[in-house]
Amino acid sequence: LSAINTQEVLPTPDSRLPTGPIWLEDESQRIGLVNIPGDLWKNMRRSKIWFLDIPFEERLKHIVPEYGVLDQEKLIAAIERISQKLGNLNAKTAILLLKEGKIAESFEILLKYYDKFYFRSLHNREGLQALLHTVNCKSVSTENADILLREAAAASQTPLA
């Protein structure tokens, strides 16, 4: 899920949920201006984590065309909302680079912030060692879904120690 489509896919009280596994991106409870409902959030925090370990530069190459086309004013507003956590200098620099059309350079600052924040949050997760499964991937690709499903199937066949 991303902040862009989170609100569209979250279940409503009258929606029927699938009975099998549901794969969600590990996110903060608040994504942009949207909050993940409390019960779903608690369930996510207790569930297995399949971490796709993709090189930084590959992820950066992926997000620039995907997010770089979004409305610049909305991107700036989002940066301003996280400016205290990002650091005022980093926020000002990211905004300036964005205004200059240097999207990759701006997003590099933001992705470094995201990674730092995510890893801190991940490593504060209760029972992380038992929940975390790392899957090494070379790039951002639809093939990663196949790799992930193979790894998950193999892990479910592994006897518990």
Question: What are the functions of these language-model segments?
Answer:
Residues 1-43:
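Conserved nucleotide-sensing/catalytic segment adjacent to the nucleotide-binding pocket
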Residues 43-49, 53-161:
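Conserved NTP phosphate-binding and transfer environment spanning the P-loop NTPase/kinase superfamily
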